[in-house]
Amino acid sequence: WSFQWKTKTSIVIPTPFAAHGLLYVASGYVGDREKHVYAIRPGAKGDISIHSGEDSNKFVAWYDKRAAPYNPTPLVYGDEFYTLYDFGFLACRDARTGKLHYGKERINPDKPAGFTASPWAYRGHVFALSEAGDTYVFKAGKKFKLVRVNHTGGMSMANPALTGDRLLIRNQTHLFSIREKK
């Protein structure tokens, strides 16, 4: 199968991924007018492009032309699809239907931050590592709620890595290995 982007996309960075039996594909280059997210059902054949006036079809569960980030890959955690935008906003929608729960909430109104690393989730929380090295912790769910901010003290642009029981966070000067107390 294949589909054609509704408009030309200049640069594609977010990684496609699967959850809830759907394949999620996003492309939101900062210079593009439209920033597409598609949730694709399995079993497709042929051309599954979205046509004018459509936001879904037989093989596209949902589509939004203004929902994609530039650098971070979106996250599905529980039943929610989270979009972390490079310029410091977080949005949440239903992962299966695309219905918006909250849109583009400013992560930190007092200290605007950029985001390159992709978000991750653990034990009911969504985490976002800013380029300034601050990790923002949100309560997972349909309502936007910032719980806390952790500081690493250095510029961070790399995606955190999960390995075994550890979370690895790299910044400009340090590599942090974090795990739960036993």
Q: How does the language model describe each region?
A:
Residues 1-182:
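Noncatalytic, solvent-exposed loop/strand surfaces
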